[in-house]
């Protein structure tokens, strides 16, 4: 077996070769390649003339000796046109019912069936057996068929509650394609002279029969770690609780997990990673509504839970809350406290300064800086006699902001705990404290918790960085996940700096 990273590089180069000359079809080619390498089926939905058949033809070149079968279904299609005509000689000479399958679906590795929903019941029933069991009943004998990839296409979805649903459920990967959108790509497509029948894949990249068979065994050996299973189960529960969510059978879940194993294997990993779960968005939808729903649910899972983003933010919220509690406790201890005076029947309570405030001028620190009179203020200097007068009779109180300039009018009050509180123009307030009493440093408990959280964030970011090299995942998803992790990291850093 090739080294995992060499295999991943080879599959990447193989995909690039298959994508050559096809515009805005990279994701479709890659997922069809993944389906072919893992023996799954694909449904392509989209209008006529958008290279659906060309995608299927290209996949033939991924293998060294692959045969292809292509057919356009109509309401009048017969099993003979898909599975081969009856052998007149066998029927006449030996009385045997036998089909001549050479050149037809039973002997093809790559199969493309266009307008699939127009197939009649006789074709559908035989096709179901071929997809499920990779067997074809030819007369009295069961023949194993070599089909590695079935690509079915249509410009419409099957009708609900129809006989077509059983076949639709067998199409594991479902892709919704559209016309070429980008102007430059559209121009390149128009002037391209590439022959669509040419083989764009070097022989050194093509997959041999022996490699293909060995890889099927290797895919099954890829592990599903418990944390990844928990994410899958969470998604399943979310879908079960949504009223408009599509029904996903146990069979489809099982086949989808094998696809995730294949994604991990061909990305050079020995275990399914959270990044592989993004593929589920192309496996679990049924119609346009459920397609959008799956996109939303996967985005919630990937940007909120797959790398512990929401859990880390919850922990951060708890740490910040604990820090506020400690700060409040410290604030109560260090705040400048005045002495309440006055009789029971006084209209207005009045206060006196504590004994330790004996100097003729008092400098009091703001426990939290405020912007007062267009200045960032960290301490205020008061004339002791003016402060005593204000505490006794009320009225206007002035103080020098940061101890400089003229004394400025202040919005100050005594709170219920007999602490002096100064407020800014938006009425945000902070208590005043004597110099030497304020505690500005972060509590050791909080500092340790934030450092631990930051280390956990770094581990999650490293995990994502190591796993993001996945050929089958669109780069837009990687950008969203990276942004979600960076947002968590920024909030942690801001908390450390406060």
Curated annotation (Swiss-Prot):
Summarize what activates or inhibits it. Answer: ATPase activity is stimulated by ViaA.
Which residues are noted in the entry as ADP-binding? Answer: 23, 49-54, 196
The source's superkingdom equals Bacteria
Family classification: Belongs to the RavA family.
- Subunit details for this protein? Homohexamer. Interacts with ViaA.
Task: Please report the name of this protein according to its UniProt entry.
Answer: Regulatory ATPase RavA
Q: Which InterPro entries match?
A: AAA+_ATPase (IPR003593), ATPase_RavA (IPR023671), ATPase_RavA_C (IPR022547), MoxR (IPR045427), P-loop_NTPase (IPR027417), RavA-like_AAA_lid (IPR041538), RavA_ATPases (IPR050513), RavA_LARA_dom (IPR046898)
* Catalyzed reaction equations: ATP + H2O = ADP + phosphate + H(+)
Instruction: Provide the Gene Ontology terms for cellular component.
Output: cytoplasm
Database matches in Pfam families: AAA_lid_8, ATPase_RavA_C, bpMoxR, LARA_dom
What is the organism field in this record?
Answer: Salmonella paratyphi B (strain ATCC BAA-1250 / SPB7)
Quote the EC number: 3.6.1.-
What role is this protein assigned?
Component of the RavA-ViaA chaperone complex, which may act on the membrane to optimize the function of some of the respiratory chains. RavA functions as an ATPase.
What subcellular locations does the record give? Cytoplasm
Q: Which GO terms describe its molecular function?
A: ATP binding; ATP hydrolysis activity
């Amino acid at each position: 077996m090739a080294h995992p990273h060499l295999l991943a590089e080879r599959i990447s180069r193989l995909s690039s070769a298959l994508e050559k000359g096809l515009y805005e079809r990279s994701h479709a080619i890659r997922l069809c390649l993944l389906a072919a390498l893992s023996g799954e089926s694909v449904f392509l939905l989209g209008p006529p003339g958008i290279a659906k058949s060309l995608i299927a033809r290209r996949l033939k070149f991924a293998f060294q000796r692959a045969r292809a079968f292509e057919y356009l279904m109509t309401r009048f299609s017969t099993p003979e046109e898909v599975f081969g005509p009856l052998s007149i000689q066998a029927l006449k000479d030996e009385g045997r019912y036998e089909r001549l399958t050479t050149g037809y679906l039973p002997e093809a590795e790559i199969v493309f069936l266009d307008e699939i929903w127009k197939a009649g019941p006789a074709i559908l029933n035989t096709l179901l057996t071929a997809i499920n069991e990779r067997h074809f009943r030819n007369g009295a004998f069961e023949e194993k068929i070599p089909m590695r990839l079935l690509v079915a296409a249509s410009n419409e979805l099957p009708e609900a509650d129809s006989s077509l649903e059983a076949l639709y459920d067998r199409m594991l990967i479902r892709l919704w394609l559209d016309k070429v959108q980008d102007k430059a790509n559209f121009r390149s497509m128009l002037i391209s002279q590439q022959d669509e029948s040419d083989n764009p894949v070097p022989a050194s990249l093509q997959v041999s029969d022996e490699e293909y068979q060995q890889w099927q065994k290797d895919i099954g050996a890829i592990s599903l770690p418990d944390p990844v299973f928990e994410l899958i189960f969470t998604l399943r529960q979310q879908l079960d609780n949504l009223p408009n969510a599509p029904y996903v059978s146990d069979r489809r879940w099982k086949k989808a997990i094998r696809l995730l194993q294949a994604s991990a294997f061909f990305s050079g990993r020995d275990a399914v990673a959270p990044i592989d779960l993004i593929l589920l968005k192309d496996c679990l939808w049924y119609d346009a509504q459920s397609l959008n729903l799956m996109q939303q649910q996967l985005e919630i899972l990937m940007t909120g839970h797959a790398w512990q983003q929401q859990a880390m933010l919850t922990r951060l919220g708890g740490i910040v809350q604990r820090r506020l509690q400690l700060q409040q406790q410290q604030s109560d201890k260090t705040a400048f406290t005045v002495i309440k005076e006055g009789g029971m029947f006084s209209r207005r309570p009045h206060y006196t300064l504590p004994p330790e405030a004996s100097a003729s001028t008092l400098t009091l620190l703001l426990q939290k800086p405020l912007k007062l009179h267009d200045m960032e203020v960290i301490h205020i200097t008061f004339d002791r006699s003016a402060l005593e007068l204000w505490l006794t009779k009320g009225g206007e109180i002035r103080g020098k902001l940061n101890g400089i300039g003229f004394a400025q009018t202040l919005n100050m009050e005594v709170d219920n705990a007999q602490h002096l509180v100064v407020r800014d123009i938006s009425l945000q307030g902070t208590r005043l404290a004597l110099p030497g009493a304020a505690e500005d440093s972060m509590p050791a408990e909080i500092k340790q918790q934030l450092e631990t959280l930051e280390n956990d964030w770094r581990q999650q970011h490293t995990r994502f960085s190591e796993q993001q090299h996945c050929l089958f995942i669109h780069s837009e998803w990687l950008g969203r996940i990276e942004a979600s992790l960076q947002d968590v990291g920024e909030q942690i850093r801001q908390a450390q700096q406060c």
